[in-house]
């Protein structure tokens, strides 16, 4: 599914603060529920996309509106030596959000059916089995109380080039530039084929993919914010009741 918004950039800018506040409120309710009540629910936001799609911007401008103590962010790069000793899902399991938290994956386990496929890191008979493995893995997460929001962030080839060019023109952006990004551009058709297979094989009723066009940053940020709000509202969250006598505590405080 692709989230829709019929307004303009100015409309989004006007709406954003209000929606940020709503998201922050819901996130705090989720966190409070796990601290004060027997509530093991959590939420996992998976951001998967090509370089410059804006994954970091979502973390900063969307998720950043929430209380950081209830957020668990993990960026998945090239596997470390230790990670390569284990199954590809090992590092994913270690980063899953605890109860009451929102987990943010900047890239994810889907690298293991995208990058490994495009670069022939493992043979097809290996990565080909991973689609079903991932589906079973995510089904278990959902059954255990984790709501999964998977976002495929798509940026056009021209827009990616413009964003990479900007990084080369601005000294404050040099740190974000990676020469390997140009090499990856040459593999664009192969990546599009891999992404298509990913969407077809791993979009399920319990963990569907949401395809978000990302050439306009204001749109992608608002669209993903709305996905988060919709998912949290679907949990029917409420503030946990006091586990103490409120009236008695008011009297104690007044006389203290």
What residues fall within each predicted segment?
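Glycine-rich phosphate-binding loop of ATP-dependent small-molecule kinases
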Residues: 1-256
